Swiss-Prot record:
<dbReference type="GO" id="GO:0005886">
    <property type="term" value="C:plasma membrane"/>
</dbReference>
<dbReference type="GO" id="GO:0009060">
    <property type="term" value="P:aerobic respiration"/>
</dbReference>
<comment type="similarity">
    <text>Belongs to the complex I 20 kDa subunit family.</text>
</comment>
<keyword id="KW-0874">Quinone</keyword>
<keyword id="KW-0997">Cell inner membrane</keyword>
<keyword id="KW-1278">Translocase</keyword>
<dbReference type="InterPro" id="IPR006138">
    <property type="entry name" value="NADH_UQ_OxRdtase_20Kd_su"/>
</dbReference>
<feature type="binding site">
    <location>
        <position position="104"/>
    </location>
    <ligand>
        <name>[4Fe-4S] cluster</name>
    </ligand>
</feature>
<dbReference type="GO" id="GO:0051539">
    <property type="term" value="F:4 iron, 4 sulfur cluster binding"/>
</dbReference>
<dbReference type="GO" id="GO:0050136">
    <property type="term" value="F:NADH:ubiquinone reductase (non-electrogenic) activity"/>
</dbReference>
<keyword id="KW-1003">Cell membrane</keyword>
<dbReference type="GO" id="GO:0008137">
    <property type="term" value="F:NADH dehydrogenase (ubiquinone) activity"/>
</dbReference>
<keyword id="KW-0813">Transport</keyword>
<feature type="binding site">
    <location>
        <position position="40"/>
    </location>
    <ligand>
        <name>[4Fe-4S] cluster</name>
    </ligand>
</feature>
<keyword id="KW-0408">Iron</keyword>
<comment type="subunit">
    <text>NDH-1 is composed of 14 different subunits. Subunits NuoB, C, D, E, F, and G constitute the peripheral sector of the complex.</text>
</comment>
<keyword id="KW-0479">Metal-binding</keyword>
Length: 189
């Protein structure tokens, strides 16, 4: 027991950093703005329903970009809609995060080859923090993406940039192919 422990052991004292308190407050109260454009919007609405109860994670949907800190782009982004996506993104206060949900918003989806009117990934117009794959992704996948956003917020701080936090998050993430290979080796042995 050190000198500090002896002095604060009988009192209600919390020793932490400002970064930890700010990050805890931000990750415990995410306010997403859903930008539902196609099939993925149906799954996003199902995720917000009572079966999955996002409010237990501190996630409260907002309809205004000025009140939200997370934009969920769900569905096909056309060339004409891209300008509006950028406008809404710019109206969000800092720090702001973007979650791309579904194949269409990630890379153009089935319209990749023949859809001249479809943006080949929303990351061409705004920075994306987390991608949720699927066509359309299940609500569980969206919840997993939201939890990744919360991990990203937890890793950020005054001395750590978002790029550094994203690199740490990518290193921490488990590669699905490695898990499959390990499972196959265990089954063979």
């Amino acid at each position: 027991m050190g000198l500090l422990d002896a002095k604060v052991s009988n009192r209600n004292v919390l020793v932490t950093s400002v970064d930890n308190v700010m990050n805890w407050a931000r990750l415990s109260s995410l306010w997403p703005m859903g930008f539902g454009l196609a099939c993925c919007a149906i799954e996003m609405m199902a995720t917000n329903a009572s079966n999955y109860d996002l409010e237990r994670f501190g996630i409260f949907p907002r309809s205004s970009p000025r009140q939200s800190d997370l934009m969920i782009v769900a569905g096909t982004v056309t060339m004409k809609m891209a300008e509006r996506v950028v406008t809404l993104y710019e109206q969000m206060p800092e720090p702001r995060y973007v979650l791309s949900m579904g194949s269409c918003s990630n890379c153009g989806g089935p319209y990749w080859d023949h859809g001249y009117h479809v943006l080949k990934g929303v990351d061409r117009v705004i920075p994306v923090d987390v991608y949720v794959p699927g066509c359309p992704p299940r609500p569980e996948a969206l919840i997993g993406g939201l939890m990744k956003i919360q991990e990203l917020i937890r890793m950020e701080g005054l001395g750590i940039s978002r790029e550094e936090a994203l690199k740490k998050l990518a290193e921490k993430s488990v590669d699905a192919q490695q898990v499959l290979d390990q499972t196959r080796k265990a089954a063979i042995a």
